[in-house]
Curated annotation (Swiss-Prot):
Glutaredoxin domain residues: 29-129
Annotated gene: GRXC4
Organism: Oryza sativa subsp. japonica (Rice)
Location of the region described as Disordered in the Swiss-Prot/TrEMBL record: 1-25
Coiled-coil segments on the chain, per record: none
Disulphide-bonded residues: C49-C52
Any one biological process term the GO annotation gives: cellular response to oxidative stress
Family designation: Belongs to the glutaredoxin family. CPYC subfamily.
Protein name: Glutaredoxin-C4, chloroplastic
The UniProt record lists the keyword Amino-acid biosynthesis: no
Record's compositionally biased regions (Low complexity): 1-13
Cited function: Has a glutathione-disulfide oxidoreductase activity in the presence of NADPH and glutathione reductase. Reduces low molecular weight disulfides and proteins.
Pfam families assigned: Glutaredoxin
Predominant subcellular localization, coarse grouping: plastid
NCBIfam families (alphabetical): GRX_euk
């Protein structure tokens, strides 16, 4: 019986270690979700990424307001990118959100625009001002 107690007590420290381990990813996920909730349009991006530049250029051409989070500049950018991958299943940038909903990357955003669905979604999100009549 003494052995059973020692084996169960030895498993406890590993349990507590496992509980402490995910704190950084959980914090990054919470931060990513806060960022997404803070703005109608959020683009997780990298400053040197041509696909990110293309999406940001499109949003600028559409006069859409958006928040860009440059993961290569953020001190916790790599943790944020991992958290986004866990959350959305998308590891690459740009990672676009509109009204809190994951839209996808560059190809997804461009396809949505080409299909005529992006502007209405941006307008509904309040990112594009509707002209007064």
């Amino acid at each position: 019986m003494g052995m059973a107690q020692s084996s169960s007590s030895s498993s406890r420290p590993s349990d507590s270690e496992q509980l402490e381990e995910p704190s950084k990813p959980v914090m990054a996920l919470d931060k990513a979700k806060e960022i997404v909730a803070s703005s109608p349009v959020v683009v997780f991006s990298k400053t040197y990424c041509p696909f990110c530049a293309r999406v940001k250029r499109l949003l600028a051409e559409l006069a859409a307001s958006y928040k860009a989070v440059e993961l290569d500049v953020e001190s916790d950018g790599s943790e944020l990118q991992s958290a986004l991958a866990d959350w959305t299943g998308q590891r690459t940038v740009p990672c676009v959100f509109i009204k809190g909903k994951h839209i996808g990357g560059c190809d997804d955003t461009m396809a949505m625009h080409k299909g005529g669905n992006l502007v209405p979604l941006l307008t509904e999100a309040g990112a594009i001002a509707t002209p007064s009549l």
